[in-house]
From Swiss-Prot:
Residues 290 are vesicular. Residues 1-21 are annotated as: Disordered. This is Syntaxin-1A. The record marks E240, H241 as: (Microbial infection) Cleavage. It comes from Anopheles gambiae.
Amino acid sequence: MTKDRLAALQAAQSDDEDMPEDVAVPVEGSFMEDFFKEVEEIRMMIDKIQANVEEVKKKHSAILSAPQSDEKTKQELEDLMADIKKTANRVRGKLKGIEQNIEQEEQQSKSNADLRIRKTQHSALSRKFVEVMTEYNRTQTDYRERCKGRIQRQLEITGRATTNEELEEMLEQGNSAVFTQGIIMETQQAKQTLADIEARHADIIKLENSIRELHDMFMDMAMLVESQGEMIDRIEYHVEHAMDYVQTATQDTKKALKYQSKARRKKIWIAICVLIAIIILVVFLAIYLT
């Protein structure tokens, strides 16, 4: 392999001497350099989504803890959600592109170290992406439940208690009037309660639209990661067993060295005993013959 690379470099150098100076010569490995740049770009986008998800959580808490609807905070929340959606679609597109390139090379029966590296990187990025989007989905679902709880408490204040099932039925109708009918708005508090109920209902509608928009993308990536799971598990299995084999081999080597050392010492002791026996025999014969 080293000789082949050396020959290729020498050939490239020879060709370069015959070329004009302004002609660019492709450098071996430039494809993988571009790939790793793309990997880093995808990783940074996923990190950006993760950071935005944390900001979304803060906005949710700020909105729910505010006594009155804060339009500025709501707009900031919508901007964050729009940015997450935009970035997530870009990540999905890039991961899909890498996946298609890998599949094309596999169909051409290409198998090399670079391909395995790309598959491993693609799998790691896909898993990370799904983890981040799962957290985002969980954040949205949690916010929806908290908005429901807020509506339920406000309805109780107005004297209209509702069960969770009844509240879900009202939400499915998509009309805030079903929540506010029968509420007498004679006081400022009643008006504020009505406004809060309508605001929370509007938040839930936006959340449900956002969840639906991201659902297909989320399921697509989740299925991809699941299909990669068996391959990754097999790789981890073989790596673990390889490590076990190395550890076992190391222990066996230590045992062999230990046994070899014992055997060597035993041979030395036997030689010493034989030598002593010979000396005793010589002395005995010398005395006897004398």
